[in-house]
Amino acid sequence: MKAIVAFMNIEGKGHPLGGLLKDNFKHCIIALQSENGWVEIDYRIGIPEVRVMAPEDFDLNSHYQDAGYITVETEQSRNIKFSFNLFCGIISVSNCVGLVKAILGVKYFSVTPYQLYKRLNK
């Protein structure tokens, strides 16, 4: 399934760890292209917000870029072998990056949006 990961700053009050995060990489969201349209999943408030964004033929990547977001187009992995590892659970971070990694099915180490961006562009 086609996916877009968008990286951005956070409007308003800001991120509690904002001073430690790279500019333009303070938050990330993911959008998935389904048969019926684009679905966006945002973990900004600590609870995944899911919303239908646009019809499937809409150029959502350009829309995000026009809004000032940095984007990476990728694919959601479907052939992931599930393996339970207690140690992984201990170092897993419940943030926007953790949610995007879980949805994409990627296992490499990244905690911040910028680390995720660098890994997606390798």
Range-by-range predicted roles:
Residues M1-K122:
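Cysteine-nucleophile amide-bond enzymes
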